[in-house]
């Protein structure tokens, strides 16, 4: 859950230093791009690249180079991986994939060059492999999505038996990379290197996935990256030495060590929970509320454009690792409820991050990424989201236009409408998968009680059910969190002692009962007066 956002300030010299670090991650072009890579795909044990256009080189040949996520330019390199074959107005390349070896090209992006003055000069756009799923050995399809069940919850494994009682089809669980890399006991060899993951964490995750699957729930893993001395190489270098102490950090794919460890970890998860005896995971969310970078995905104090481009590289590594094992897995980015609003510094508006991320993905090859977002009430403690909280009216934070500052359950359609634009469509031409990976309402605090919480869940779910582009919601949470209760938030369907609140029974029945008895809390007699069922 997002915390209180504090406005960040920094000195000019510090900003320049961070920008310098990030600029090293941007691709460098030494010539005009007169060649366009149209396709980059796996076929058998080869990577095939097809390009159009032409460029003048010293020898009339075209040379293909592979760049790892942590590499930014061809520079002085001479190790091209293929020579192009012009045919019928196009240029074709073929180079080995080297799957599951130290030379693997699974995470490479490719660029066409020509010889000039003894160097190889890029003359094309860059493109990653577009179909990593071509080598997948499994496919864990979502049963709940197929049946139209949108109900999910941020689960708590001691109460796993309640998932089927609630009728939820999705269960969310958070996975912290640092916890798995600290300690060992479970070995995994990937691309020629052996990694040892914390046996206790792995076995606990085995148990959680199996328990949730046994309750007929699809599992959604939220991947986060905390700091520890043993995993400092997985933390974005721009976030180190800043004196900040966020909950989670941006993943480091700017160095070989960081990128390879992240790829191996995501491969490990996707391979392990791929429908075998250890269970299956259908969805992965890469990072939590990444636009709230200062708290949840810290990369340093950098402009949003640089942040979004770097996040796209992290996502691409995770996506290719996951899809190369599980062709049916859904992989999501994650933003909070702030759309245009930001608190300055490294706290960005969600729309700006989405725009920058999408631009970078389109630049380097469109893939089937999805969006998860968190349309909480404004503020978080104001559970009756259908009203404006005292003192918030003059701020005008919520409206039903693309210029809204915040997204709540009342204007979720702003997001789904935005994603129907041509530039945001999936490679298939359809609207991308959109989910809500966190949403909750407190039963305590000013103006709140257990009936208000129950009404908020009923109303918000009916709005979600009426939106055909939202595939699922994870309500947060199953149980009141004692720490959050001290902060004035009691979002659980159960209280901290495990006793059901009215919200429990409402969520249990919300997809099969009118629940009109809760409509008066929002100012109507029946939900049909709001056009809802």
What are these regions (language model features)?
Residues 14-25:
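Bacterial N-terminal signal peptides
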Residues 4-14:
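Bacterial N-terminal signal peptides that target proteins for export
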Residues 262, 277-282, 306-447:
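Noncatalytic carbohydrate-binding groove/subsite architecture in carbohydrate-active enzymes
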Residues 31-139:
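Beta-strand-enriched, solvent-exposed domains that form extended recognition/catalytic surfaces
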Residues 24-32:
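Sec-dependent signal peptide cleavage junction
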Residues 150-152, 169-172, 216-220, 281-285, ...:
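Structural preference for beta-strand elements that scaffold enzyme active sites
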Residues 70-78, 82, 91, 113-271, ...:
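N-terminal substrate-binding region of glycoside hydrolase catalytic domains
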Residues 242-244, 274, 290, 295, ...:
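Aromatic-rich peripheral "rim/lid" segments of glycoside hydrolase catalytic domains that contact
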């Amino acid at each position: 859950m997002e915390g209180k956002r504090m406005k960040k300030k920094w000195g000019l010299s510090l900003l320049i230093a961070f920008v310098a670090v990030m600029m090293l991650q941007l691709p460098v072009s030494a010539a005009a791009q007169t060649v366009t890579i149209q396709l980059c795909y796996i076929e058998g044990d080869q990577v095939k690249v097809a390009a159009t256009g032409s460029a003048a080189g010293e020898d009339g040949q075209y040379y293909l180079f592979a760049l790892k996520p942590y590499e930014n330019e061809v520079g002085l390199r001479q190790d091209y991986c293929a020579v192009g074959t012009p045919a019928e107005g196009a240029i074709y390349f073929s180079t080995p994939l080297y799957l599951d070896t130290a030379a693997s090209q699974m995470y490479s992006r490719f660029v066409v060059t020509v010889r000039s003055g003894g160097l190889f000069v890029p003359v094309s756009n860059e493109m990653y492999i577009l179909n990593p799923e071509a080598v997948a050995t499994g496919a864990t399809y979502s049963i709940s999505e197929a049946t139209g069940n949108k109900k999910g919850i941020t689960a708590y494994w001691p109460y796993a038996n309640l998932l089927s009682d609630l009728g939820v089809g999705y269960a969310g669980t958070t996975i912290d990379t640092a916890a798995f890399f600290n300690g060992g006991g479970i070995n995994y060899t990937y691309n020629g290197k052996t990694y040892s993951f914390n046996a206790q964490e792995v076995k606990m995750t085995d148990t959680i996935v199996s328990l949730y699957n046994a309750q007929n729930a699809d599992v959604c893993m939220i991947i986060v990256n905390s700091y520890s001395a043993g995993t400092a190489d997985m933390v974005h270098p721009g976030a180190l030495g800043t004196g900040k102490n966020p909950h989670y950090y941006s993943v480091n794919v700017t160095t070989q060590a960081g990128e390879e460890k992240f790829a191996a970890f995501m491969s490990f998860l996707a391979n392990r929970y791929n429908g075998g005896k250890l269970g299956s995971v259908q969805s992965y969310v890469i990072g939590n509320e990444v636009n709230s970078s200062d708290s949840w995905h810290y990369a340093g104090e950098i402009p949003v454009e640089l942040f979004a481009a770097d996040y796209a590289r992290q996502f691409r590594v995770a996506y290719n690792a996951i899809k190369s094992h599980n062709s049916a897995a859904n992989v999501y980015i994650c933003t909070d409820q702030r759309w245009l609003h930001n608190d300055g510094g490294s706290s960005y508006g969600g729309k700006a991050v989405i725009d920058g991320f999408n631009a970078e993905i389109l630049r380097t090859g469109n893939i089937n990424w999805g969006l998860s977002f968190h349309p909480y009430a404004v503020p978080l403690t104001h559970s009756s989201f259908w009203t404006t909280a005292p003192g918030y009216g003059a701020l005008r934070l919520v409206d039903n236009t693309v210029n809204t500052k915040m997204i709540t359950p009342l204007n979720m359609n702003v997001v789904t409408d935005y994603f129907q634009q041509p530039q945001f469509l999936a490679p298939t031409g359809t609207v991308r998968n959109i989910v809500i990976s966190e949403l909750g309402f407190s039963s305590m605090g000013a103006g709140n009680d257990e009936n208000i919480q129950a009404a908020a869940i009923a109303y918000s779910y009916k709005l979600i059910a009426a939106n055909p582009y939202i595939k699922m919601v994870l309500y947060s949470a199953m149980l009141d969190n004692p720490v959050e209760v001290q902060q004035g938030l009691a979002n659980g369907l159960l209280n901290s002692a495990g006793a059901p609140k009215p919200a429990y029974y409402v969520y249990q029945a919300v997809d099969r009962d009118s629940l009109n008895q809760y409509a008066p809390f929002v100012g109507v007699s029946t939900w049909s007066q709001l056009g809802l069922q």
